[in-house]
Structures are given as structure tokens and as C-alpha cells.
Amino acid sequence: MANSRQYYPSQDESMSPTSVRSREWEGPSRWTEYLGPEMAASVSSTRSSKQIDGHVGGSTKALNIQWVVQMIEVADGLMAKMYRLNQILEYPDPVGHVFSEAFWKAGVFPNHPRICTLLSKKFPEHFSKLQLERIDKFSLDSLHDGAELHLQSLEPWIQLLLDLMAFREQALRLILDLSSTVITLLPHQNSLILHAFMDLFCAFVRVNLFAEKIPRKMLLQVYNLLHALSRNDRDCDFYHRLVQFIDSYDPPLKGLQEDLNFVSPRIGEVLEAVGPSIFLSADTRKLRNEGFLSPYHPRFPDILTNSAHPMRAQDLANVTSYREWVLLGYLVCPDELLRVTSIDIALVVLKENLVVTLFRDEVSLYQMVCEKEFGIGISFASADSINLTMQYILLHEDYQLYVLPRVLESKKMAKSGRTKQKEADLEYSVAKQVEKMISEVHEQALQLCDTIHRERRILLKQEIGRMVLFFTDQPSLLAPNIQMVFSALALAQSEVLWYFQHAGIASSRSKAARVIPVDIDPNDPTIGFLLDGMDRLCCLVRKYISAARGYALSYLSSSAGRIRYLMGTPGIVALDLDPTLKGLFQRIVQHLESIPKAQGENVSAITCDLSDFRKDWLSILMIVTSSRSSINIRHLEKATVSTGKEGLLSEGNAAYNWSRCVDELESQLSKHGSLKKLYFYHQHLTTVFRNTMFGPEGRPQHCCAWLSVASSFPECASLIIPEEVTKFGRDAVLYVESLIESIMGGLEGLINILDSEGGFGALESQLLPEQAAAYLNNASRISAPSVKSPRVVGGFTLPGHESYPENNKSIKMLEAAIQRLTNLCSILNDMEPICVINHVFVLREYMRECILGNFKRRFLTALQTDNDLQRPSVLESLIRRHMGIVHLAEQHVSMDLTQGIREILLTEAFSGPVSSLHTFEKPAEQQQTTGSAVEVVCNWYMDNIIKDVSGAGILFAPRHKYFKSTRPVGGYFAESVTDLKELQAFVRIFGGYGVDRLDRMMKVHTAALVNCIETSLRSNRELIEAAAASMHSGDRVERDASVRQIVDLDTVIGFCIEAGQALAFDDLLAEASGAVLEDNASLIHSMISGIVEHIPEEIPEKKEIRRIKGVANGVGVAGDHDSEWVRLILEEVGGANDNSWSLLPYFFASFMTSNAWNTTGFNIETGGFSNNIHCLARCISAVIAGSEYVRLQREYQQQHQSLSNGHHSSENLDSEFPPRVTAEASIKSSMLLFVKFAASIVLDSWSEANRSHLVAKLIFLDQLCEISPYLPRSSLESHVPYTILRSIYTQYYSNTPSTPLSTASPYHSPSVSLIHASPSMKNSTTPQRGSGSGSSSTAAPDSGYFKGSSSSLYGQEHYTESETGNSRNNENNNNNKQRGSSRRSGPLDYSSSHKGGSGSNSTGPSPLPRFAVSRSGPISYKQHN
């Protein structure tokens, strides 16, 4: 061979495959490659001890057993290599000669399908007879050119064929040796050697059955062709021997039946001996009724017992092996079925199984037979499942093809009379029964196998559950019953593996190729119960492992005395044992007597290696069970059984078993309780888990067991194939991650079920606590209700009776969901970390991330509905509902989930530091990771409310303090998302960061609008200056001409209205913030309010004072929100920095000439105008005040800078008034200028032909005086008599509140040109609302900006411009604070006489018609002006 091997005798010999001839009989050392490191080390140590040890007989006999164990390991190694070859070749079909495209691209065989496939089909014909040059000369030439390269790729697999051939010869020799020399192979006498013998027998069968799955024929033929092409047409040395070997095992079962014919009688004896244990394991009723797997006494449950049937229960641990012996034994030794007792044994096992596993997930099946004759299919797994690669041949078809013909032949021979008549009749009868059994058992298996195993799984579920409860309560009884625990684990292991081995199998009832899938229910909940029971039982054993070791040590200590006593009995003395055997017995006693005594809690500290004891006992067994020994097992039993106690060998076997509980308890537990083989079905495992975990019978606590299975998956990897270790570990990690994903998906599902309209949402639609209290109070007042009618006056049932009985199921569903949620959270919280390779999975952390991640996803999902933004109040209720569920789960975990939810809300709300509080910048790494939710909400408010990009007709309603729309904005009207309750919900959700973000966005938007105003102011400066001069000079013509030339006046008005909307919205937001702060942090709110009252009034303001004012303005406790807000904007953008801003009053006064007034009307229901022009008043007042503050602040800064430079003396800087008073006086002066000239323009523009806009403009000016804290209400009185305004308001408020003033034709009469219709005109069409007092009381509470009474109105007329601003400022602050209370009465609240006159049904003329025909009104005012 090209690849040298470490066990070759020399380098030269190892260079050629022919060296196998010199290595065939080297013994176990030649198999080092197929053994693990531990087994290889034991081989070398055994060889060295053999050379040193003088006890030739004993050590040689013991070495034979070691060889048996090694050959079993070699079989696993050979099958691992074949399994790997099949994987590389993408699972070919060598029987049907079907090879995929991936097969040829794998790099093992030359990519010349025609020649290679022909060689395989024509096996065993030599290639020289096939005339390959005629088949494909090009491929043949290519093979000749690359022969050496192809030989190197095939040599490792040719060596595998040689090793298979050598294994056959050595294994057969060992099997023959054991069969011919061991005098007894009964489970109760010689179980250790029996298991070694049968394990080797089954391994031999499996290797040769599995060998057919690799392309042996093609491998040998192609290799020989390449060898001949490169060696002058000379065949390789081993060609003919391999041809004979492969041909003899084609098909494998015929070769196996011939090779194993010589051991057939011994196999039949063994299978008959294990029959009782198989019958017992199949009888679930007997197992349950007689308590074979129960620590309770079968007939007296109150009496505790070690085990009802200790020996038989212990033997149940081996039933899985016994079943495999039966299935494979009768398959390769069919003559043994003709025993009378064998029929029932085979029937029981065949009825329960459809397949036999060969290696890992490979099963004993012939693909050709399945596809061509039986139509095998897959019904359980998905199309991409790994199990699609499994090559199925059903077990029953194997029996029909290879066992039934032998039975029929025996039947024919018996019928022909070739044997004695009596024996012939018996043989014929038995053969006929076997024939009937084989023919019928297939149908029975298809119908009953799943039912049988489901019943067995239910039994094991119950018994293991009882065991766990019992041993948890009585741990001291676990150690004596440890063998019974192993039996229960082994049976459960067998059932779980059977379930997944048969998942996806489909069979046929006849040769008509009708595919009948085996009904393996993927929703079977018993699998989860078994996994959980096994896991908990193993945990109990590990928990009390010291107690089990202590019990075993005490048993062995007592066993030493019993064995010493038996060695001194007369029978043993009379046997005259040879020195070798006697020495071994003495060493056994010494081993047992040298065991340290178990004392109290020091058991865990005892280290005791009993491997030498077990080796010596195996040596004794090999001697006394050998037919060549003068003293055999029967002699020893007869010599010691007369004592009335256990025989010598029985004592030794029991001591051997208990010794394994001292130093090999973990390996014993792993053997019986490990489910590592489930790795090969892990995709099915995942499917069943998902179907059952959260099903009606699923249990949250089972997820621990499903996950812990993965820890043992990497143990399935073969050490001789290094890449498997990595792959299996990676698959185990992926399996755990997949299950964790399913578990967390289920956890999310439970939370989402509760957090739905059908969950806790349905409870929210029931009676509120106040309603329930009223309902109970009402019910308690009913005396002695009738029994027949439990209803009360309101139609409700009395307490104790169901109002909606159909809701019972929903309530029970909620209770079940809550129970599952709390159980699952508790289980995940208490679960130990899952360790797979170097990965550690802590389920508590996954649960935390799941709950918090689910909350974040649901929060972001609930943020927007299908139509548009979710209402903040609804979003808040959803958050509270979800947090209630999280709090429910939090009670069962040791984690602070509430803190995590707060962090999520903070993360979604934090878009940067609060501008008025923080001085740091937002970290760069948080630019894209925080504030996503608040950005969505703020952008929506900006686009749909402030900017109205959808054109929904957004209007601000001062009276109700919200924005309204003429059509829905998304899914809601604007009023349902902008009132104070909704904004307070927004503040509670997003906190100060959300408020600041929305405030900053409105500031940026308003800054852009103010910049447009400044741009227009500068571009029209000359025209505005000319208009201002003409206004002062009284030149109306020049004024009108200049105003008409101002560019884009209507556009600027639109900008100002939009800025006013932003001011109004920010004012609402500040009020909502203040209300929330007062509710949740009243001390902080009162502290801010107190600080604002004592802030020093100075210009320029210090940075700290400015920040405090910003905070106060943000929570609605500042004196003037609008002007302070605009002032901050102008300071940030550097506005109002030139003299053009002094023209603002004149520029704003020119707005009175705009066409916007022609399309507006006042609406008393909203307290505003139909085109939102009342927001212009806020903008004008705020911009004038803000710009004046900024202008004066800059002047003072410049003066102080000049003073510091020594240009002026300090006396020049002294002022008569404080800077704040000066600023307020300047603002008041500018506002009075605006009012004066605006009123002048309004009244001058009125004429008989154009008077429809007059009322709107007058109301606008009145509202401006009301809004501005710097103007007295009487400011307009000097220009427009208040009798006119009172008449206008009386006309509006005595009519229908929702009737706006629309555009009227200039040709209408005066009474119609000023209003829609007078009350007298409305009387015929619209019913009166009642008396004036009634109408005023209806409209008064929510009339918006207007002051409360006539005294308050006219009390302000005594203020003049020369009054000091300090007292004015204090009054303005107080008025601003009381705006929501004292100004709610509206303009009609002048006096009772006015109310009565304006709203009565008297026949006298109404005030507005009197004003319309009077010449003492606006005309005389205009002339006076």
C-alpha cells in the first residue's frame, strides 16, 4: 500500500497490499487502527503482561475474553469506516447499481461511469473478458494515464476490504472456539461469557450485512484494472481471495447462514434460555400487576421492599440485547426455528419489530428488494431529512426471503419420510407452524407493533414516575434497588430508540407493492414523559451515588466472608482444585477483604479500583466453563449448593455485578440510561419535541430532558474518523439551539396568548371595578330575591350566578395558559446549564432575552396599526397589559425582568440628551441603536399634525385643547391622538426623552419657518418701511400701494400659521408633561414651580437660568410658553440680529390685506377659525415677544462688552428700569403698534362691496389681545368699540354653536353680509336652544381663550402704556396660569342682562342687526380715526 501503517512489520512490506498475507494471523495487535486509545492501550498492556505473567493457563484463558471484547470493538471500527465511505459516496445503491452524480465527483472512483458500472455488474468476471476498449476506449485510455493517482485514492478502501476479510476469519475462529469449549451458555449461570459470545456473534452478523451497502464489487474490480494497467496486466495478489470472499457473501445472509451453521445449535440453546425474560418483558399486565419494576410490594403496597423479584427484574436490563439476539439469531440460523419453544419466542419479537439496526441509523434492509418488490417509502420525516439516506429492507421480508425457504425445505424433507415417522411428524408439524407464523406475523406487526410499544411506553411512564417519587422520598432504598433502576432505564431506552428507529418506515402487505406507512404518531406525548423520567432517575442516582457505592462496598465486604466459607466446605475440599484455580479463588477473597470499610459520610472519599478483581473472576469463569478443564461449573455448583445458600459461582457473579457499582457506576448508568444514539435521529427528535412540548399533554418540565440528551451526542463519534468529532459536536449544538428556539417560541406563544384580545384583553372588556361595585351595591339592596329568578332590577344576575356561561372555556384556557407559563418559567429558571463540547447554554439567560425581546417586538409592532400610528393611550394599555404578564412570570424566576423592560423603553425613547438638562452629546455608537420607536411617533406627529402632509385639514381647537381633522389621519381622526389624555399617555411611555425629541423636532421645524419670515422681512424691507411711514402719516393710498407690492404675503402667512400650530402643539405637550410630572413626582413639580417664581429677572440671562427656564417651559409652569420657546429658537439659530426685525409689527399688520380672510369663518365649537388662522395670532405674539427679548439681550451684551473695553462709563449704562421691565415695555409697544395698524387696515378695507372678512378679522384681533400676556384686553377698545365685538359674540353664541361664518356675497343686505343668518332668520329653520342664560351656560365652560366677566374685561381698560411692566408681568403670569379656569366662561359672560337680551325669544331686534344698520359703529369709528 502507498500509505504506511504503524503496525506493519517493516516499511518495505507495508508498501504493498500483499503484506496483508503476512499480517493476517498476527492476532489482536493488527487491529490497533480500529480500536480506541483506551482499548489499544489495554491490548499492549495485555501482551506485555502475557510475556511476564507465569500463570499461562489462566492468563491465556482470560486473554481469549479480551480478544472477544476487542473484536467487538473492531467490528464497530469497521462499520464506522464503511459508514464514512457511504457518506462520502452519497449513499450509493450497489445492489441495483444506481450511482448519483455526487458519487462520481467524490474523488474515490474515477469519473468514468460506463466502465466502472460495467465492471460492477459483470462481477466476478475478469476485466480481460469484457472488451472494455469497445465499451469506452477514451475512458480506458484516461484510466491508463492516471492509474497511479487513482490507485492512491482507492488503496485505503481496498485495505478496508482486506480487513473485512481478515475480520471474518478471526471472528469466526473466536466464535467457533467459544462455542466448542464453553460448556454452558445460560444467562443465570454464565451471563458474562454469554454476553461476550453473543455480542461478538451479533457484531459479526452486522458487519457482513453492512458490508453490502458499500460498492465492494466496483471497488475491487476497478482497483484490479488500475493495478493491471500500471503493472503490465498483472492482477494484484489478493484479487482472487477477495473475489471469493465477496462472492460468498452475495447476498450476505446466505453466506452468514453457511458460515454460522456450525454454531447454530448453541445459538438455539441461548435463544431458548432467554425466552422467559422476553415473554416477561412483553407482558405489560404481568409487569404492572406483580410489580417487577416497582419498589412497592405487589400485594401489600404499604410494605416497602427492595424488589418484588430481584433476579428477574435485574435480568430485564438485558432484554434489549435478548431481542436483538432473537432477531439476528433466527435470521442467520433458521434451523433453530424448528424447535418447539422457538416459535413463540420469534413470534413475540417479530410482532414488535419491523427493522433491525445494523450500525447507527442504518438498518437491515435490501434496497433492491424494497424498491422493486415491496415499494418502501418514507412517511414521517421531511424531504430533507437525513433519514432519506437510510436503505430500508424490512425484517419480515428478510425472513420470507431467507428463512422461509429453509423452513419449507425442512417441511419437505419431513414429508418425504427421510427420517423416522414419529420424528418426521413432529418436524413437519413444527415446520408448518413456523411457516404459518412467518407468513402471518408481518400483517400482525404492521397492525400491532405501535400499539404494543405505546402500551409499554405508558407502563414505563407510570413506573418510572413512581420510582422517582418513591426514591425522592426514600433515598435510602435507592442503593438496594439500583439494579431495578438500571432495568427500568434500559427498558425506557429501548422504547425511545424503537420509536425513532421506526419513525418514517413504510412497508407493504403483499408483493403488489402497496405501500402501507407504519402509523408512528409524531404527537405521542409518552416520549417526553420517558425522557423526563429517565433524566430525573439518572439525576437521583448521581445525587445519591455515594450511598450506592457504600451499599455496594458493604455487600462486597460481606460477600468475602461467604465466599471464604464456601471455599472451606467439604465439597470444595473434595474437588481438590488445581493450584491455578485455587490461587485465583484466594486472590478473589483477598480482593474482597482488602476493600475499605464504608463509614458514614466518608464514602465519597473512598477510591477503590476493582478491575483486578473482575479480571480474576473472568479468568475463573473461563477455566470452569471450559470443556477442557477437569473442574467445571457443574462441579462447583454441586459442591456448594448443599449448603443451602447461594452457590460459589452465584456469589461470585453477584459480587462481580456489585463491584461495578463501586468504580463503574457512571459507566453502568451511561450504558442503561444514555440516549446518545438519538443523535442519528435528531431531526425526528426535534419534530416530535415541537409537536408534543406545547401540546395538550405536554409538560414544560420535560424540556430539560429533551435538551440534556444533546450532551451525549458527541460520544457517538468514532475516534478513528477525526472529522466526526467536530461534526457531531456541531450538530449537537445546532440541535440544542433549535430546541431552545422552539422552547422560547413556545414561551413567546404563551405570553402572546395571554397578551391578546382573546386573553387578558377579553377581561378588560368586562365590568370595571367601579361598575362592579355599583352592581354589588345594587344587588345588596334587593331583599329576599326569588329563587326561580335570580335577576335584579337592572337585568343582571345576582353574584354567584354566571352572566356568560359560554365564557367558561375561555377562562379555563387562560388559567391553563397561566399555569403553563409559570411552570415553564420556573423550570427554565431552575434548569442546570446544558454543556455540549465547549458550549454552555444557560436557559435562564435565554428566557430573559426571549421575554425582553418579545416585549420589544410586540412594542414596536403595536406602535403602528395596519392603517397608521397606534393611539398612545391604547399603546400604553397594551404595555401595561404585557408588563402585567411579565410581572406574573417574574414571580417564578430569580431575575429582575421589570428592569429589563424599563431599559428597553428607555432605549426606544432615548434619541439624545435632554437639551435643557444635559450637557453631553449622544454617543456615536448609539446613533443607530436607540430611539427608533420615539422617532417613528415623533415623525408621525410632525408629518400628520404639524405639517399635515396628508392634507387631512388639521385644525387646532383652542376651546377643547386638541387638534381635529376633517377626515381620518391614518386610522383615527386627529382629535383622538392629540388631546391631553393621549399626550399624557405619550409622556408616560417615552418620558422626558420622548418629549424633548418631539420638542426639538418642532423647534427645528419652527426655526425653518421663522427663517422664512426673516427672509421675507429682509427681501421686502423697503416696502415695509414705506408702508410703516405711510401708516404713521395716515396716507392710506401709499400704505395700500406698498402693502400690495409685498411679495409672497399669503405664503408667509401660511408659514406663520404652521408655526402657530407648532406653538400650540408644544404648549399642549408641555401641559401634558407637567400633569404627568405632578402625578408621579409632585415634589419635583412643586420645586420647579417654586424656582420659576424666584428666578432673577435679568438680561442677559445666565446659562444656568436659561436651562432652568427651559425645564420649566417644558413642563408648562413658565410664565409665557410661546415667547420663551421662540426666544430659545432665535438664540439657537442666531435670528433677530438686525434692524429689519423692528419692522415686524408693520409686516404682520400687512397680513390683514391677505386673501386668506375671505375664506375663513369663526367656529364657536372649536373656538377657532375654519382655516386655522387663529394660530397666526400665537405666532405673531410669540415672534414679536421673542425677537424683542433677543434684540435687547444682544444690545445689553454689546454694551457690557463695550464697558469691559473702557469705551463708556458705567453711568451711561444705568437705566431707570430693570432690563426685564424694559423688554416687556418694548414688547408691549410693538404689540400695540401691530394692533393699532392692523385695526386701521381692517376698518379701512371695509366697504359696502367688501365686508365679509370684517367679522373674522375683528375676532382675530380680539383673540390676539387675549392670547398675548403683554397686552391688556382693552387694547382693542381704543380702535374698535367693544359693543361691536359684544354684538358679534352675542350673535354667535346665541345661535347653533357649530355654525361658522362663511363667505357671503357682497350684494347681500348688511345683516346678512356680516353673519350667516341672524337669530330671527334662523327661527324658521333651526329650533332655538332656549334662553340666553341656558345657551351661555352651555357654551361658557369651554370657550377657549376669552376672559371670564365684564369686570375683568373692562378692568383692563384703565391700563395705559406708561404703566410699569412689573405689576403687568405678575398679572400676566397669574392670568396665564388661570387660563384654563378663569377664562373658560367665554365672551358672552359679560352680565346677566346681556345674556338674557342676547339669547331671549323676545320680539325686539337682536343686537347684531342694530349694529348692522347703525352709523355709530365701524363707519363712525373709521371717520373718527
From Swiss-Prot:
Expressed in roots, root hairs, hypocotyls, cotyledons, stems, leaves, trichomes, and flowers. Residues 1-24, 1299-1425 are annotated as: Disordered. GO terms for cellular component: endoplasmic reticulum membrane; nucleus; SCAR complex. Residues 1362-1405 have a biased composition (Low complexity). GO terms for biological process: actin filament organization; actin nucleation; multidimensional cell growth; positive regulation of DNA-templated transcription; trichome morphogenesis. Residues 1-20, 1299-1312, 1320-1329 have a biased composition (Polar residues). InterPro entries: Nck-associated_protein-1 (IPR019137). Coiled coil: none annotated. Pfam families: Nckap1. Binds PIR. Involved in regulation of actin and microtubule organization. Part of a WAVE complex that activates the Arp2/3 complex. Belongs to the HEM-1/HEM-2 family. This is Protein NAP1. It comes from Arabidopsis thaliana. The lineage of its organism: Eukaryota, Viridiplantae, Streptophyta, Embryophyta, Tracheophyta. The gene is NAP1.
